[in-house]
A protein has these predicted regions:
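STAS-like cytosolic regulatory interaction modules
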Residues: 1-60, 76-128
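Conserved TIR/SEFIR loop-to-helix hotspot centered on a Trp-containing motif
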Residues: 63
Length: 128
């Protein structure tokens, strides 16, 4: 990247909705220089013992092997606590995941945050 060219950094925002559903929104590049941001977010999530988390990666433009490692380790850590993770990938993230992991890494991979919310609602209604 030439000097002076802006580098696309990873932005992460963790929010909990009024209904208790937590959404981690990611935007930018998940690579060697930014993967720790993702790891830190997963640590914050794992400390909360949540039922469901939506990982909104629709604005992730690039992910490398370091980012994939952070994603898989974070998913493992959260999943071990019984938290269900809904991944909403960008086309770039979806393609890399499909190439690297022939079997789906995330059982709940959806096309939109709205679809994830709908599935959580159905799951919650079905548990009653």
């Amino acid at each position: 990247m030439p000097d002076g060219a802006p580098q696309e950094l990873l932005e992460a925002q963790l929010t909990t909705r009024a209904d208790g559903i937590t959404i981690l929104e990611l935007a930018g590049e998940v690579d060697m220089s930014s993967a720790q941001i993702l790891v830190d977010q997963f640590v914050a999530i794992s400390g909360q013992r949540l039922d469901n988390v939506i990982l909104d990666a629709t604005r992730v433009t690039f992910i490398d092997s370091t980012g994939l490692h952070a994603l898989t380790e974070g998913k493992r850590k959260i999943h071990e606590q019984g938290t269900r993770i809904f991944l909403v990938p960008s086309p770039q993230v979806r393609r890399v995941l499909e190439l690297v992991f022939p079997e789906p890494l995330f059982a709940a991979r959806v096309d939109s945050v709205e679809e994830a919310l709908s599935q959580i609602q159905l799951q919650t209604t079905g548990d009653r």
